[in-house]
Design a protein with these regions (language model features):
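Membrane-proximal alpha-helical signals and transmembrane carboxylates
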Residues: 2-202
């Protein structure tokens, strides 16, 4: 009986270790993830939806001080925002991770027609952080803002973060998080409010 008990215990231990191995193997390495820092939504041609996901390129490049911190972006389009989201995986060479999204940008045309379908998509995603900040890009597309900001050595997410640091002096309104926006849209007695960013020529 004792031998059977030892054998049973060993089998149980092997099964447990096997389960742990599967859990560990299920985790993606950091270099296998496309960690999104900025999500951008726009209206594309013929009424299609466009999504741009941007991550921070941490490559040091050459020269130390001249290290690049630009963003890497992937663009996807679809007949609806849900189609565009599904199509993202076909353009990514890594697994998308939205758990570190800091900023969500909307092009002006999207804002005028309504951002609810986009907020619905975001709120259904299990990884999105509800403290991510929302902005509308006035007079332009969100994708265009990201592309312009990433032509320099600074990452667009870092630029947006610097704007927030000085929001009391440079802005006429405060920040709105994803959680606050969802509460605003859910409450009939509250006015809809999302701050905007207006690109200026340099």
């Amino acid at each position: 009986m004792r031998k059977y008990a030892i054998l049973t215990a060993l089998l149980a231990l092997m099964a447990a270790l096997s389960g742990c191995t599967q859990i560990i193997m299920g985790r993606a390495e950091i270099d296998k993830l496309f960690i999104v820092r900025v999500f951008s939504f726009d209206e594309a041609e013929k009424g299609k939806a466009r999504i741009t996901v941007t991550t921070k390129d941490l490559s040091t490049g050459e020269g130390g001080e001249g290290a690049t911190q630009k963003g890497e972006s992937v663009v996807s389009e679809g007949d609806t925002v849900f189609d565009a989201a599904r199509n993202l995986s076909t353009y990514l060479d890594r697994k998308l991770n939205a758990g570190h999204t800091e900023f969500i940008l909307f092009g002006e045309s999207i804002a005028r027609k309504g951002v609810l379908p986009y907020l619905d998509l975001i709120s259904r995603h299990p990884e999105f952080r509800y403290n991510a900040k929302l902005y509308i890009v006035k007079g332009d597309t969100a994708n265009s803002l990201v592309e312009k900001a990433n032509t320099s050595k600074y990452f667009v997410g870092d630029r947006l973060a610097r704007i927030e640091e000085h929001i009391g002096r440079t802005s006429i309104s405060g920040m709105v998080t994803l959680n606050e926006a969802l509460l605003i849209f859910d409450e009939r007695n509250l006015d809809t409010f999302i701050p905007y960013i207006e690109p200026v020529p340099t």
